[in-house]
């Protein structure tokens, strides 16, 4: 038995595998799930539409996505459409423990006799625990997983790199400059290779497709495709308009300030704020903080995004120009080493630093941890790091997603958009698999519009209907789609 297995074991009750913080939290979680269902009209509409069809029957979906109340509604939607599901979180801090417990127990079970879905997630996992949970999510009794639902690409990477190393006959040793997380990742694969030399290959051969939620994970998929390493089709859910223009912007606009407020309780009005990146997420960040009265500056590499920021009223600067005067610094780029150790040393005393991109490498956490700076934990996911000159910075969620680490993430309504796309994408790949090559695709425009229509109606909006003559004049169908693929919303 390996070191990891000695400390971490799968629990099982009433035939349900799980590893969560506390099953007794299930009643609290179920109450919040019921409220969330009311705010997630897209998912509830899909349940009604496909209730008699069960289009996902036979699908064994391994899901790696933040284990929140909203995700619980997604999981139970997949199950209601016929799928079997196993789940883990895609972030060590993002799990809401009452939601995880409620999913395991299920709507008709009890903590003593759960009747729900296997979940392996709890808030505050170590890196070793995180990757152990990811493996459990992908480890099915009997036949392997045949679908992946991913957020950030960790589940996909675990399967593909595991299969790649099995083919090579060896898991490579970690390099000195590899991140702590990558070392844990390699160690898990090495331990598993010692006991099962074909595990990941079998899973890779079984999987029919993957649907990916985030910008970071989509980038990984395109890299796998370009290298000829993608063994199954993938749908890029992130770039569905009803995901990227809503979750990324409006969700962030809500949850960023929630995380900052819960983590620090500082007044945002009047503060100097630096937002690194002005994509959809960065736009939501800037808008939310400016709305609180902050004085916002933006960094950008792309002149188009930079021009948008200027036209929206924000100065465009470099990190080096603004880091010394900023009271709050937020990274939202999807890239690495945006805030380096030198940048952190140059920040004001007690300045706040946080990330709302997917991974913790936007802020060079490895360099900070090696620097000799002392760390004092103020409260969960809030740390004060003091440098040798005596000044300190306040770091949120250890450089990981502060909106999920310090708060509860995006609200239910906006996640209904994103998760409706996930469900539709899973149905698409599962039921029409032979129509897709091993490449990365986007959902069709009419499906994007379908998701939007449901939510317009839920908010009480009334859509104008084209006449036949008007539709012919602009060369579209009366029922849509109304825009070409190249249209920029």
Curated annotation (Swiss-Prot):
It holds the Pfam family AdoHcyase_NAD. Binds 1 NAD(+) per subunit. Gene3D superfamilies: Adenosylhomocysteinase-like (3.40.50.1480), NAD(P)-binding Rossmann-like Domain (3.40.50.720). GO terms for molecular function: adenosylhomocysteinase activity. It catalyses: S-adenosyl-L-homocysteine + H2O = L-homocysteine + adenosine. It comes from the Bacteria. Signal peptide: none annotated. It is found in: Cytoplasm. It is an enzyme of class 3 (hydrolase). One of its GO terms (biological process) is L-homocysteine biosynthetic process. InterPro entries: Adenosylhomocyst_ase-like_sf, Adenosylhomocysteinase-like, Ado_hCys_hydrolase_NAD-bd, NAD(P)-bd_dom_sf, S-Ado-L-homoCys_hydrolase_CS. Substrate binds at residues 68, 151, 213, 243, 247. Pathway: Amino-acid biosynthesis; L-homocysteine biosynthesis; L-homocysteine from S-adenosyl-L-homocysteine: step 1/1. Disulfide bonds: none annotated. NAD(+) binds at residues 214-216, 248, 277-282, 300, 335, 356-358, 403. GO terms for cellular component: cytosol. HAMAP family: AdoHcyase. Belongs to the adenosylhomocysteinase family. PANTHER family: ADENOSYLHOMOCYSTEINASE (PTHR23420:SF0). This is Adenosylhomocysteinase.
